[in-house]
Amino acid sequence: MTKKALSAVILAAGKGTRMYSDLPKVLHTIAGKPMVKHVIDTAHQLGSENIHLIYGHGGDLMRTHLANEQVNWVLQTEQLGTAHAVQQAAPFFKDNENIVVLYGDAPLITKETLEKLIEAKPENGIALLTVNLDNPTGYGRIIRENGNVVAIVEQKDANAEQLNIKEVNTGVMVSDGASFKKWLARVGNNNAQGEYYLTDLIALANQDNCQVVAVQATDVMEVEGANNRLQLAALERYFQNKQASKLLLEGVMIYDPARFDLRGTLEHGKDVEIDVNVIIEGNVKLGDRVKIGTGCVLKNVVIGNDVEIKPYSVLEDSIVGEKAAIGPFSRLRPGAELAAETHVGNFVEIKKSTVGKGSKVNHLTYVGDSEIGSNCNIGAGVITCNYDGANKFKTIIGDDVFVGSDTQLVAPVKVANGATIGAGTTITRDVGENELVITRVAQRHIQGWQRPIKKK
């Protein structure tokens, strides 16, 4: 049997009043990514040919935050219920394709669960994702007759007997385009809310003698939504613990999974150690035996083997060679590239610069738009003065250079191999090979000096 084409509809038009935020609900993040972006990514993983994104509240913000997403933007000007939302996309449905309905505020649904749901869909019928809850309050109840799903009753429309049912609707369903269009046209709003419920499709399918099957989600959290910040925080921690558990099983030593955040992807070698309160963002690659101290933030970095990153260091868009030591309290800004066996110490900031093998920048230093050769020593308080108020300029330092403390290198300037720069020097001209340069004012001694006295 030929596999049907698939398209997805993502409902994302809600305001999210209980978030108390100017952002539309679905733009609030899980692991640093908008909830709806998680759902869009899952729809792509399923192989969806089209993704119809139903939006409404905060439309401009939605389009700004999701500007790069390959979706069909479908505006729902009035929020009149879930069936009304899907109906806005119905003109785009192909009769012979499967349509899966997803929710922008339920970000943890997995590709594997949806594949099972699609596989279970009967010809011309509906496959419905359900879950059993100990406390089903607020959810639509699944009504069965002789084991078959015949209806879904919303909380506000349920009678006392129906309210005791534990099996509930998640809202996720699959049917073909032709059936969706046929049934959506027949949905009414004769209910307590006066809305057009997507759940009414179940009864309509039964009226047409079309089979409705239920597939139960095995993980309740996978189908949980976030309507307020408390629920959002619960989803965040669940997702982070799930990611941490996977990394632990792969051999990464995360000392406290409850205090670890992965907001992107992590590729790792063997015997990696990650202390508490570490945040990984973007795409990060860690070599073998990397140690990351408490409170560090790593974003889009590549770290070589045997590197130690000491506590409270921040690295972004940088590359670090093997056996380097960084921190504590170091900052590598975009474009920083450290070669093997380099040392970058406390309160050092490096931006758009290269540091050669074995060189040390140990404390209280700013290096920007620079090239530092191998086996150099950059003393405390050194500043590369790279900006004249309008343009940036480069500082180039050769190999085996010693730069004394409190030196200012006013770019553009070059320091040749083997040069020595005395402490407190301001360099404004190029320094030759093996030269010693000192620009300090001669030290004066005044005997019997009297300090000024405050006037009474």
Swiss-Prot record:
Its recorded name reads Bifunctional protein GlmU
Q: What is its EC number?
A: 2.7.7.23, 2.3.1.157
The function of this protein is:
Catalyzes the last two sequential reactions in the de novo biosynthetic pathway for UDP-N-acetylglucosamine (UDP-GlcNAc). The C-terminal domain catalyzes the transfer of acetyl group from acetyl coenzyme A to glucosamine-1-phosphate (GlcN-1-P) to produce N-acetylglucosamine-1-phosphate (GlcNAc-1-P), which is converted into UDP-GlcNAc by the transfer of uridine 5-monophosphate (from uridine 5-triphosphate), a reaction catalyzed by the N-terminal domain.
One GO BP annotation is: peptidoglycan biosynthetic process
**Would the keyword Lyase be found if you checked this record's keyword annotation?**
no
**Among its keywords, does the record have tRNA processing?**
no
The protein's assembly and partners: Homotrimer.
Q: Which organism is it from?
A: Haemophilus influenzae (strain ATCC 51907 / DSM 11121 / KW20 / Rd)
Active site per the UniProt annotation: 363
Record keywords: Acyltransferase, Cell shape, Cell wall biogenesis/degradation, Cytoplasm, Magnesium, Metal-binding, Multifunctional enzyme, Nucleotidyltransferase, Peptidoglycan synthesis, Repeat, Transferase
Residue span of region Linker: 230-250
Disulfide feature? none
User: What happens when you mutate residue 25 to A?
Assistant: No pyrophosphorylase activity
Ligand binding (Mg(2+)):
105, 227
Residues where acetyl-CoA binds: 380, 386-387, 405, 423, 440
Per the record, the major location class is cytoplasm
Gene Ontology terms, cellular component aspect? cytoplasm; membrane
Gene behind this chain? glmU
**Entries under PANTHER family matching the protein:** BIFUNCTIONAL PROTEIN GLMU, NUCLEOTIDYL TRANSFERASE
Q: Which GO terms describe its molecular function?
A: glucosamine-1-phosphate N-acetyltransferase activity; magnesium ion binding; UDP-N-acetylglucosamine diphosphorylase activity
Give the EC class as a word: transferase
What are the boundaries of the region N-acetyltransferase? Answer: 251-456
Listed binding positions for UDP-N-acetyl-alpha-D-glucosamine are 11-14, 25, 76, 81-82, 103-105, 140, 154, 169, 227, 333, 351, 366, 377
InterPro entries linked to this entry:
Bifunctional_GlmU, GlmU-like, GlmU_C_LbH, Hexapep, Hexapep_transf_CS, MobA-like_NTP_Trfase, Nucleotide-diphossugar_trans, Trimer_LpxA-like_sf
